[in-house]
Amino acid sequence: MKQTEVVPTITPLIPESTSPILQDVDEDQKYISLFPVYTLRAACGYFGNMEPVSMLGWMRVPWNTKKDRTKFIVQAVGHSMEPRIHDGDYCLFETYKGGSREGKIVLAEHQGEVDSDYEGAYSIKVYHSKKVFDEDGYWQHESITLQPLNRNYDPISIDTEDADSFRIVGEFIDTIEVE
Protein backbone atom coordinates (compact mmCIF):
# COMPACT_ATOMS: atom_id res chain seq x y z
CA MET A 1 0.00 0.00 0.00
CA LYS A 2 1.29 3.43 -0.88
CA GLN A 3 1.64 6.29 1.56
CA THR A 4 -1.06 8.84 2.20
CA GLU A 5 0.32 11.95 3.81
CA VAL A 6 -1.58 13.60 6.62
CA VAL A 7 -0.10 17.04 7.11
CA PRO A 8 -0.34 18.56 10.60
CA THR A 9 -0.50 22.28 11.28
CA ILE A 10 3.11 23.44 11.23
CA THR A 11 5.16 26.56 11.61
CA PRO A 12 7.08 28.02 8.65
CA LEU A 13 10.01 25.86 7.55
CA ILE A 14 12.24 28.94 7.22
CA PRO A 15 13.07 30.75 10.48
CA GLU A 16 11.38 34.15 10.73
CA SER A 17 14.72 36.00 10.98
CA THR A 18 15.74 34.74 7.53
CA SER A 19 12.28 34.58 6.01
CA PRO A 20 11.97 35.68 2.38
CA ILE A 21 8.54 37.11 3.21
CA LEU A 22 8.57 40.91 3.18
CA GLN A 23 6.14 43.25 4.90
CA ASP A 24 7.07 46.78 3.80
CA VAL A 25 7.40 46.88 0.03
CA ASP A 26 7.24 49.50 -2.71
CA GLU A 27 3.74 49.75 -4.16
CA ASP A 28 5.15 49.98 -7.69
CA GLN A 29 6.78 46.52 -7.35
CA LYS A 30 3.65 44.70 -6.18
CA TYR A 31 2.45 42.15 -8.74
CA ILE A 32 5.51 42.82 -10.92
CA SER A 33 8.48 41.38 -9.01
CA LEU A 34 6.69 40.87 -5.68
CA PHE A 35 3.71 38.56 -5.23
CA PRO A 36 1.47 37.87 -2.22
CA VAL A 37 2.26 34.88 -0.01
CA TYR A 38 -0.69 33.18 1.66
CA THR A 39 -0.78 31.21 4.89
CA LEU A 40 -2.39 28.15 3.39
CA ARG A 41 -0.20 25.09 3.33
CA ALA A 42 -0.76 23.10 0.18
CA ALA A 43 -0.22 19.47 0.95
CA CYS A 44 1.94 17.48 -1.40
CA GLY A 45 0.09 14.45 -0.10
CA TYR A 46 -3.61 14.31 0.68
CA PHE A 47 -5.61 17.49 1.24
CA GLY A 48 -4.12 19.71 3.94
CA ASN A 49 -5.63 21.05 7.13
CA MET A 50 -8.74 23.17 7.32
CA GLU A 51 -6.74 26.33 8.04
CA PRO A 52 -8.06 29.85 7.52
CA VAL A 53 -6.21 31.56 4.67
CA SER A 54 -4.73 35.04 5.02
CA MET A 55 -1.90 36.99 3.45
CA LEU A 56 1.52 36.70 5.16
CA GLY A 57 3.28 39.36 3.11
CA TRP A 58 5.15 39.62 -0.17
CA MET A 59 7.90 37.56 -1.78
CA ARG A 60 10.30 38.63 -4.50
CA VAL A 61 10.52 36.46 -7.60
CA PRO A 62 13.74 36.43 -9.66
CA TRP A 63 12.07 37.90 -12.75
CA ASN A 64 9.75 40.79 -13.59
CA THR A 65 6.37 40.44 -15.25
CA LYS A 66 3.72 42.80 -16.50
CA LYS A 67 1.58 43.88 -13.57
CA ASP A 68 -0.47 40.77 -12.88
CA ARG A 69 -2.77 40.43 -9.87
CA THR A 70 -3.60 36.82 -10.76
CA LYS A 71 -0.36 35.37 -9.37
CA PHE A 72 0.18 34.27 -5.77
CA ILE A 73 2.56 32.15 -3.70
CA VAL A 74 1.94 29.25 -1.30
CA GLN A 75 4.32 26.94 0.53
CA ALA A 76 4.25 23.23 -0.30
CA VAL A 77 4.26 20.65 2.47
CA GLY A 78 5.07 16.98 1.93
CA HIS A 79 6.88 14.77 -0.54
CA SER A 80 4.32 13.47 -3.04
CA MET A 81 5.27 15.96 -5.78
CA GLU A 82 8.98 15.18 -5.67
CA PRO A 83 11.17 15.48 -7.63
CA ARG A 84 9.52 18.63 -9.07
CA ILE A 85 8.23 20.24 -5.84
CA HIS A 86 9.90 19.58 -2.48
CA ASP A 87 8.71 19.90 1.11
CA GLY A 88 8.95 23.59 2.06
CA ASP A 89 9.20 24.95 -1.50
CA TYR A 90 7.47 28.24 -2.21
CA CYS A 91 5.33 27.78 -5.33
CA LEU A 92 4.11 30.50 -7.67
CA PHE A 93 0.61 29.92 -9.05
CA GLU A 94 -1.64 31.77 -11.44
CA THR A 95 -5.31 31.97 -10.50
CA TYR A 96 -7.25 29.44 -12.57
CA LYS A 97 -9.35 31.25 -15.18
CA GLY A 98 -10.88 28.33 -17.04
CA GLY A 99 -9.82 26.10 -19.88
CA SER A 100 -8.19 22.71 -19.96
CA ARG A 101 -6.29 21.60 -16.88
CA GLU A 102 -5.43 18.16 -18.20
CA GLY A 103 -1.88 17.15 -17.29
CA LYS A 104 -1.10 20.43 -15.50
CA ILE A 105 0.11 20.81 -11.93
CA VAL A 106 -2.68 22.54 -10.03
CA LEU A 107 -3.57 23.83 -6.58
CA ALA A 108 -6.86 22.14 -5.74
CA GLU A 109 -9.31 22.96 -2.96
CA HIS A 110 -11.72 20.41 -1.54
CA GLN A 111 -14.24 21.87 0.91
CA GLY A 112 -15.94 18.66 1.98
CA GLU A 113 -17.42 18.69 5.45
CA VAL A 114 -15.68 21.70 7.00
CA ASP A 115 -16.47 24.50 9.40
CA SER A 116 -17.75 27.55 7.48
CA ASP A 117 -15.11 29.71 9.23
CA TYR A 118 -12.41 27.94 7.24
CA GLU A 119 -11.45 28.09 3.59
CA GLY A 120 -11.09 24.36 3.00
CA ALA A 121 -8.23 22.01 2.31
CA TYR A 122 -5.62 22.30 -0.42
CA SER A 123 -3.39 19.94 -2.38
CA ILE A 124 -0.85 20.30 -5.20
CA LYS A 125 -1.10 17.55 -7.83
CA VAL A 126 -1.20 16.80 -11.56
CA TYR A 127 -4.82 17.07 -12.78
CA HIS A 128 -6.45 14.34 -14.89
CA SER A 129 -10.09 13.91 -15.81
CA LYS A 130 -12.22 11.64 -17.94
CA LYS A 131 -15.30 13.13 -19.55
CA VAL A 132 -18.43 11.54 -20.95
CA PHE A 133 -20.71 13.15 -23.53
CA ASP A 134 -24.47 12.81 -23.79
CA GLU A 135 -26.43 12.57 -27.04
CA ASP A 136 -26.72 16.39 -27.18
CA GLY A 137 -22.95 16.84 -27.04
CA TYR A 138 -22.83 18.09 -23.45
CA TRP A 139 -20.12 16.64 -21.25
CA GLN A 140 -19.66 15.95 -17.58
CA HIS A 141 -16.79 14.53 -15.57
CA GLU A 142 -16.80 10.78 -15.27
CA SER A 143 -13.80 10.95 -12.95
CA ILE A 144 -11.24 13.42 -11.64
CA THR A 145 -7.85 12.24 -10.42
CA LEU A 146 -5.13 14.26 -8.74
CA GLN A 147 -1.89 12.41 -9.45
CA PRO A 148 1.29 12.74 -7.37
CA LEU A 149 4.66 12.71 -9.16
CA ASN A 150 6.24 10.56 -6.43
CA ARG A 151 5.27 6.93 -7.14
CA ASN A 152 5.30 6.17 -3.39
CA TYR A 153 2.00 8.04 -3.01
CA ASP A 154 -1.50 7.15 -4.17
CA PRO A 155 -3.53 9.40 -6.46
CA ILE A 156 -6.54 11.22 -5.05
CA SER A 157 -9.85 10.40 -6.72
CA ILE A 158 -12.64 12.97 -6.58
CA ASP A 159 -16.09 11.38 -6.70
CA THR A 160 -18.57 13.00 -9.07
CA GLU A 161 -20.85 13.51 -6.04
CA ASP A 162 -18.09 15.62 -4.43
CA ALA A 163 -17.46 17.72 -7.54
CA ASP A 164 -19.43 20.68 -6.16
CA SER A 165 -17.09 20.93 -3.16
CA PHE A 166 -13.97 20.70 -5.32
CA ARG A 167 -12.32 23.42 -7.39
CA ILE A 168 -9.04 24.33 -9.02
CA VAL A 169 -7.62 27.46 -7.39
CA GLY A 170 -4.52 27.93 -9.52
CA GLU A 171 -2.13 26.54 -12.09
CA PHE A 172 1.49 25.99 -11.07
CA ILE A 173 4.09 28.25 -12.70
CA ASP A 174 7.34 27.47 -10.87
CA THR A 175 9.06 27.14 -7.53
CA ILE A 176 10.83 30.18 -6.13
CA GLU A 177 14.39 29.70 -4.99
CA VAL A 178 14.88 31.17 -1.53
CA GLU A 179 18.29 32.67 -0.85
Where is each model-derived feature located?
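Signature of the catalytic double-stranded beta-helix
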Residues: 16-17, 32, 57-61
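Helix-turn-helix-like N-terminal two-helix hairpins of bacterial/phage DNA-binding regulators
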Residues: 1-23
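Short secondary-structure boundary/capping segments within folded domains
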Residues: 25-29, 63-66
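Short beta-strand/loop turn elements enriched in aromatics
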Residues: 39-75
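Acidic/glycine-rich C-terminal interaction modules and beta/coil loop segments
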Residues: 64-179
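Glycine-rich, charged/polar anion/phosphate-binding loops
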Residues: 21, 59-61, 92-93
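Short structural boundary motif marking the start of a folded domain
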Residues: 30-35, 72
